[in-house]
Structures are given as structure tokens and as C-alpha cells.
Amino acid sequence: LEFRRVLFRSATIKPFKGIRPPQDLVEQVASRPYDVLNSEEARAEAAGNDKSLYHIIKPEIDFPVGTDEHDEKVYAKAAENFRLFRDKGWLVQDDKENYYIYAQTMNGKTQYGLVVGAYVPDYMNGAIKKHELTRRDKEEDRMKHVRVNNANIEPVFFAYPDNAVLDAIIRKYTAQKPVYDFIAPGDGFGHTFWVIDNSEDIAVITKEFAAMPALYIADGHHRSAAAALVGVEKAKQNPNHRGDEEYNYFMAVCFPANQLTIIDYNRVVKDLNG
């Protein structure tokens, strides 16, 4: 039985009701990922902008300089700010479950990714492949963030095997006017976004992923681990767990393998300890 589960393993995804900014606010809300800058850099980038997502993903910026970013009051502030953003209409949930296309342009190259709900059991059983070890302290930090917000505020990036059917769907939508299209001042990258709301296209995308043997984490090992572990927690805490609840999925942007660029990730050893 165990062999059959491994042999016929496939990728499970689902559409979801995204929570996102109105078109006229997207440039004010958008931020860089939480782990590419420190607290003071985030504080500087968010200065004078109460709509910046940094108030949710780096909420220590709303406290005096030097506040421990892992203090419980900081996580509580993230949840408070997330509620505030929704109450004020700075983040609005879509009415129906969709897939999305997110394109990122940097150094003259554009990569197109499908934004999906990835399946927690796929992470736990190895259908989502990892290539990094994770640290428990960093996992717990992101787990607390997921718990207090009851949401994945930032996506993880996956890679998937090249697929002509998905390529055609992406081309069809990206030939249309995007919902968002802007260059972020923080990184100079282009960010473009489309909504896939056609039920037939949604069904085809789901089917094509189901035929894939695996997905591969390109970026976001700690966020993936945190989302999956919180999903497992919630399943254990729910006596009526069915397997189709929202906590069984987490937000991922999936890019085809032919659009990936492998970049050096170098380190300098300054001290050989004697």
C-alpha cells in the first residue's frame, strides 16, 4: 500500500478566493518579501505609507526601534493590521475561487507563474520536493505569523515540469490587459497580474497539475514548512476534519522549469575557528 502511494503520487492544487488590493492601491500595498530586508530597512521603505504590506509582514516597524520582532505583541500587531487592511478596503477578498497569473520582470527577463493553493499533504508526503534544510526557530516564527492571521500573507515559489497545455493558457491570459502592472520602487522589478476566472480553464489547470509527479520548492522553504505544519495542527484540532478545508492548502506561485535561472548563492568563510 505504501509503495502504491509513492508510485502514483501526484500534485494536488485548488483555486482560492484571493485577498488582494484594489487596482488603484496596489503600488502602495506591495512590498518586498519579509526575509530580504531587516526591520530598519522595512521601517524606512514604509515611512509615510500606512498601506504598506510591511505593517503586516514586518509589524515590528509599528513599535519603537529595537523592539524584538519575535515578541508576542508583534505577532498580535500583524493580525491587528491585517484586520485593519481588510476593514479599510486596502485588501479585498475575491467573490469566487480563481487561479491567478503573476509575472515578475527583472534584468530584462519575465517569468510567468500560476498562483494556486498547494496541498499540505503533498508537502508532508514528499510530492513537494525540498532542497534545503530548515531551522525550527525560523519555522516557528512563520508558523506564529500564519496562526495569528489565519492566512498565508506571502506566497512561496515552486517550479513544475514544462507543460504545453499550461503554457497555452498562460499565453491566452497574458495577451489580455492585466489587473496590475507596475514597477516596484523597492526593487525596480516589474510586477504584472491576471485573474483566471473561467471555470473550464480552472478545471484544465487542476487536471494538468494532477498529472505531475511532483512540484519543487524554488524559494520559501521555511514558509512552506510553516504553512504545512500549521495545516497539520489545524487538522488534528478539528474533530470533524474532512481534508477539503482551507487550512489544507497554502499559497504558491508555480513557474515552469524552462523559465528558471539558477543563480549563485555564495558565502565567504572568514574564520576557520583556529
Question: How should these model regions be labeled?
Answer:
Residues 8-274:
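Surface-exposed, charge/polar-rich loops and edge strands
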Residues 1-7:
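Short, small-residue-biased leader/transition segments that mark boundaries at the very start
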